[in-house]
Amino acid sequence: MKADIHPNYPEVAVTCSCGNKFETRSTFGKALAIDVCNECHPFYTGKQKTLDTGGRVQKFADRFGAFGAKKA
């Protein structure tokens, strides 16, 4: 690595809206406030909802499926 071209990379305190606090390194340089973290995000907590994408796709196909069909 070249000398004197890299930005300052200090440790910063990160605070989540759920109250979880941890430290990481960032070029931002100040304390960070975030909305979600691994302690409160639904994917990590196991409280994830499964969306019914199959039903939504079928509803779209029913409404617009024949839109591009050529008439005989």
Swiss-Prot record:
The keyword rRNA-binding applies. InterPro entries: Ribosomal_bL28/bL31-like_sf, Ribosomal_bL31, Ribosomal_bL31_A, Ribosomal_bL31_sf. Zn(2+) binds at residues 16, 18, 37, 40. Its cofactor is Zn(2+). The keyword Oxidoreductase does not apply. Keywords: Metal-binding, Ribonucleoprotein, Ribosomal protein, RNA-binding, rRNA-binding, Zinc. GO terms for biological process: translation. Binds 1 zinc ion per subunit. PROSITE patterns: RIBOSOMAL_L31. One of its GO terms (molecular function) is structural constituent of ribosome. GO terms for cellular component: ribonucleoprotein complex; ribosome. Binds the 23S rRNA. Part of the 50S ribosomal subunit. Belongs to the bacterial ribosomal protein bL31 family. Type A subfamily. PANTHER family: 50S RIBOSOMAL PROTEIN L31, CHLOROPLASTIC (PTHR33280), LARGE RIBOSOMAL SUBUNIT PROTEIN BL31A (PTHR33280:SF6). This is Large ribosomal subunit protein bL31. It comes from Pseudomonas fluorescens (strain Pf0-1). The lineage of its organism: Bacteria, Pseudomonadati, Pseudomonadota, Gammaproteobacteria, Pseudomonadales.
